[in-house]
């Protein structure tokens, strides 16, 4: 049921309503979820809920540059962090998954018996939904894991 609701929301959120109606929808979404828009354009500037949901920062954020700092790639709430030994299960959105089930063949065979650290970050509808890296880097591969 959760997947169906997400698909319906995604479909409706992509619709570009007439400006007066879109402004009303955006403002209700922002106030309903108590979104802090101080780092973003005004709600009326977004042509759809999808555009608002995936809004860009007006300027780059500052972050802690100390070597001991953990910089999260996204806004959100850290639900869980830990070490998974021998690919034991972790919880994501209320379901238990083995790391191999989540990441499949992307795990190097040499890591399969190793202790792997993980962080589970929940992005609520009010959170900023873009990801950033606090360093110069090049992505060598990406893996899409569809939800239910």
Residue ranges and their predicted role:
Residues 1-148:
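Non-catalytic terminal segments and appended small domains
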């Amino acid at each position: 049921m959760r997947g169906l609701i997400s698909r319906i929301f995604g479909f409706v959120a992509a619709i570009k309503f007439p400006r007066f109606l879109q402004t009303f929808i955006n403002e209700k979404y922002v106030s309903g979820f108590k979104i802090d828009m101080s780092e973003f354009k005004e709600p009326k500037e977004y042509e759809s809920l999808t555009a608002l949901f995936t809004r860009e920062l007006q300027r780059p954020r500052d972050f802690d540059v100390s070597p001991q700092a953990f910089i999260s790639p996204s806004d959100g709430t850290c639900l869980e962090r830990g070490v998974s030994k021998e690919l034991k299960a972790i919880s994501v959105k209320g379901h238990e998954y083995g790391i191999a089930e989540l990441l499949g063949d992307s795990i190097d065979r040499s890591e399969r018996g190793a202790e792997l650290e993980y962080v589970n970050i929940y992005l609520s509808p009010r959170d900023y939904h873009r990801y950033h890296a606090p360093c110069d880097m090049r992505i060598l591969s990406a893996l899409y894991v569809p939800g239910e």
